[in-house]
Amino acid sequence: MTFSSPLLRFAPSPTGYLHIGNARVALLNALLAQKLGGDFMLRIDDTDTERSKEEYASAIREDLQWLGITWQREEQQSLRFQRYQAALEQLKASGRAYACYDTPEELDLMRKTALGAGRPPIYDRSALRLTTAERAAYEAEGRQPHWRFKLNDSAIDWTDMARGDVHFDAKNLSDPVLYRADGRPLYTITSVVDDGDFSVSHILRGEDHVSNTATQIQLFEALGFAVPEFAHLPLLVGADGKPLSKRWSSDSLKAMCADYEPEALGAFLVALGTSLAAEPVESLETLLESFDIAAYGKASPRFDVDALDALNGRQLQHGDHVRFFLRLAELGIPEEKAADFWAVISGNLGKFSEAKDWWRIINEAPDEIAMTAEDTEFCQAAAALITDAVATKEGYQDWMKQLKKTTGRKGKSLFMPIRHGLTGRSGGPELDRLIALMGVEAAQKRLGRN
């Protein structure tokens, strides 16, 4: 069997909100689908009916759309339980699925015994040696079987789009559980059945799934499906090379929406793991030209928050100003003042949410500012010399020259006390533009009170 056209998928479980690692996987799958000229499918893996919630599924959809990801098809696993059961019956009939009556305690003892003997902790297939009478005795005790897939004792090889040639010896792998004793299907079978039924041609996921892939390849074949191509990418780590902090590994993408621009976050996530520098982009489509799955290395990409903040700040300067103005209105900033305000402060933002702080600084004098007596006296002298002309670049430069001549100050000792006196901060927009925005009279009052 072959695939008529490329189809990729992202398959989140709606047992929680979308986090940064999964968002990256979704982005890369969506981009690869476009690069190959195929379609992208969202599959909601909600077979865990106790923990899955529509609230989470809806939030995942919203987060993907916020990132600019679109999909041409959506499927839901909870609507397909009969299909999974049919696949299990097919495997039973072919002798590739078998019933196991081992309890969790017995399996744990089996694992510890194998490790103690220096053997790999794989299932010993003792269930295959049970007699009919022994099975009947277990069921009389009330034991319900779980079902395993019997692997062929052969080599499992594939050429991974990201890792190159991959080899597993099936005799060193445990026969995977397909169905729990309570009758619930597990990811191993549901994912393969869906990928096979829907003709998913390429599967891109984290390297923690590599061993799953080895067993699933045999399952694809046992069910008569074509085997997709695979790409397994290293998992993200923190800037220090250690596992991501709880904030980034478990917090939802939605929590980041107020701080980061979707284009900046998308460009940053896509560039991670390659030698390419992340740059501000207009949309995800902009990334297609340079996107190449072969460009991703085998080392774990480092998620550097400072680098993301820097890129986000640049995105704010290059992004859609109309969209930013609408968001400024949501912060209570009048429409008629939005353009001038944005022109002055956008270059000093790392996150959009900081715009609200600058609006407050411009319109409300800081409560108390700790300054030396010398700087306080200097600011008062500056207030005495300020004129309406200071709101222009030329007038501001003349004011600085006059202050320099009058006080003997120069460099940082000249302009830093003024910035501090006006804003309470050591950094920010150019002072002439800032004064023009807050008004010369307000600037004079702030400097004169120090």
Language-model segments: what does each one mean?
Residues P366-G395, W399:
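Long, amphipathic alpha-helical coiled-coil segments characteristic
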Residues S4-R9, E285-F291, L328-L331, D388-R409:
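Short amphipathic alpha-helical segments and their helix-coil junctions
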Residues P12-L18, I203, Q402-G408:
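A short glycine/serine-rich beta->alpha loop
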Residues M1-A117, N212-F225:
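N-terminal Rossmann-like or analogous alpha/beta NTP/dinucleotide-binding catalytic cores
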Residues A99, T103-H232, V237-L244:
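Active-site cores that bind ATP or allylic diphosphates and position pyrophosphate for catalysis
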Residues N29, I60, L91, G95, ...:
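Residue-level signal for inorganic ion chemistry
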Residues V390, E394-N450:
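Charged substrate- and nucleic-acid-binding regions of tRNA-handling and nucleotidyl-transfer enzymes
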Residues F225-E368, T423-N450:
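Catalytic adenosine-cofactor/nucleotide-binding cores of aminoacyl-tRNA synthetases and other
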